[in-house]
């Protein structure tokens, strides 16, 4: 039996052990992607999904083994080893094969790398509207911003947001997580966080005014977040955007843009 057939045979067992332990949004999104990759025989995506499962185990292994309600530690040990073994045995897709199977041309990839997805709670629309306007004032085109609280930046009608992100933003789109108490109180936002984290390697975190909680979920706590109320963070954001889009901005104009944004935050 070849490796792919064996993986398909073992997949339900692997998924069952994982879902028996947790149905958190991050894990369920990885598993959905894993299932899709197996159905399409996409080796590159299968390897990517297995890498994500391997990373999930690395982050959660200690918690699993310390949990007094987990009675199948051996099954988790075996499942993690299976994931590693399949990664070792599955062929690596070389660059020639990648170029022939990818759904995106190089021009489309470069275009997608410019996209910014604003992951936010609709209850924070006023602050996030001001933030999107800030990005546009710095020089980001409205076409490069995906922001569902605005009809000018939203996802096309009849499109499922998660499927749209998987289908169109898989190749390098940047995600801006706009964290607030409203964000963490929303199951929808947490699901969105999981889906975008799985499908994007590029992200930045922003702390909205009044946020009283702590950074949780899949976001790296050790990666410094931008505070919208800190002048130095706004400056660093501006510099980041200018580098991303190869833009220039006069200091005097930036001061006017920053002042307008700060006024809208109050």
From Swiss-Prot:
It catalyses: NAD(+) + H2O = ADP-D-ribose + nicotinamide + H(+). Pfam families: TIR_2. The active site is at residue 192. One of its GO terms (molecular function) is NAD+ nucleosidase activity, cyclic ADP-ribose generating. GO terms for biological process: signal transduction. SUPFAM superfamilies: Toll/Interleukin receptor TIR domain. Its EC number is 3.2.2.6. Residues 112-261 form the TIR domain. The keyword DNA repair does not apply. It comes from the Bacteria. PROSITE patterns: TIR (PS50104). Keywords: Hydrolase, NAD. The TIR domain mediates NAD(+) hydrolase (NADase) activity. Self-association of TIR domains is required for NADase activity. This is Uncharacterized protein YddK. The lineage of its organism: Bacteria, Bacillati, Bacillota, Bacilli, Bacillales.
């Amino acid at each position: 039996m070849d490796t792919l057939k064996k993986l398909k045979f073992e997949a339900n067992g692997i998924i069952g052990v994982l879902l028996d332990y947790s149905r958190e949004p991050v894990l369920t999104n990885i598993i959905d992607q894993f299932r899709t990759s197996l159905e399409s025989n996409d080796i590159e995506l299968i390897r990517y999904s297995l890498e994500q499962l391997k990373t999930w185990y690395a982050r959660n292994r200690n918690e699993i083994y310390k949990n007094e309600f987990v009675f199948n530690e051996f099954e988790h040990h075996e499942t993690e080893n299976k994931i590693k073994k399949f990664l070792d045995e599955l062929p690596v897709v070389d660059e020639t094969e990648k170029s022939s199977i990818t759904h995106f041309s190089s021009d489309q990839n470069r275009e997608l790398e410019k996209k910014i997805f604003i992951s936010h709670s609709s209850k924070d629309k006023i602050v996030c509207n001001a933030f999107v306007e800030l990005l546009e004032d710095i020089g980001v085109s409205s076409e490069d911003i995906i922001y569902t609280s605005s009809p000018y930046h939203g996802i096309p009608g009849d499109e499922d947001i998660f499927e749209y992100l998987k289908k169109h933003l898989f190749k390098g789109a940047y995600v801006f997580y706009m964290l607030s108490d409203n964000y963490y109180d929303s199951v929808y936002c947490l699901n969105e966080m999981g889906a975008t984290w799985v499908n994007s390697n590029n992200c930045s975190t922003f702390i909205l005014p009044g946020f009283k909680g702590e950074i949780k979920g899949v976001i790296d706590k050790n990666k410094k977040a931008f505070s919208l109320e800190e002048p130095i963070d706004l400056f660093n954001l501006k510099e980041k955007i200018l580098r991303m889009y190869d833009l220039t901005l006069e200091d005097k104009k930036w001061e006017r843009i920053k002042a307008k944004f700060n006024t809208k935050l109050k």
